[in-house]
Amino acid sequence: MSKVTEITHPLILHKLAFIRDKNTGSKDFRELVSEVSMLMAYEVTRNLPMEEIEIETPVCKTKCKVLAGKKVAIVPILRAGLGMVDGMLQLIPAAKVGHIGLYRDEETLQPVEYFCKLPQDIAERDVIVVDPMLATGGSAADAITLLKKRGAKQIRLMCLISSPEGIEFVQKAHPDVDIYVACIDEKLNDHGYIVPGLGDAGDRLFGTK
């Protein structure tokens, strides 16, 4: 079964309180989501593979560790996941960015891909899927399935807030994918919103309803 990491750093929890607040406007909301994403990325990337190289300082030659291979690909789930990308790129500026857009067919309830643009070398990269909310878990699980079909092997999921139901769903669908969240909330309500949650992340990021 995959590992679930709840990142309870004081700075993250402080900023998360203002993200939740319904009186926080879109400008501040966007900035806070970006800041929390950057802070979370530090923990999410903790176990990236390393390799040893030799460099020369002004004093002598020495061996140092650097990231191995082709590094990271960040893949936001449209559209709310876009709000997390800039913060992560501040910490991992060399990362490539892919995009996945999915919706569910109302009759078949099956996922329908309406947009997918990924780095050609996605199979060689450590992939971090980002979405502010992990509610039912359906969209995240579908996005991960799509990534695996495109060849991705090392995948992590990073969300600001999750429901217990969403975590359980993704773990059952993808027991090999570790999940990182800033907070695991109480439950989903009858409308599929996380309680207490933060409302609709996409609407709050982009000022829409």
From Swiss-Prot:
Chain residues that bind 5-phospho-alpha-D-ribose 1-diphosphate: 79, 104, 131-139, 200
Biological-process GO terms, alphabetical: UMP salvage; uracil salvage
Chemical reaction(s) catalysed: UMP + diphosphate = 5-phospho-alpha-D-ribose 1-diphosphate + uracil
Keywords: Allosteric enzyme, Glycosyltransferase, GTP-binding, Magnesium, Nucleotide-binding, Transferase
Single annotated GO MF: uracil phosphoribosyltransferase activity
Pathway: Pyrimidine metabolism; UMP biosynthesis via salvage pathway; UMP from uracil: step 1/1
Activity regulation details: Allosterically activated by GTP.
Keyword set includes Glycosyltransferase: yes
InterPro entries recorded: PRibTrfase_dom, PRTase-like, Upp_B, UPRTase/APRTase, Ura_phspho_trans
Protein name: Uracil phosphoribosyltransferase
Provenance organism: Clostridium perfringens (strain 13 / Type A)
Organism lineage string: Bacteria, Bacillati, Bacillota, Clostridia, Eubacteriales
Gene expressing this chain: upp
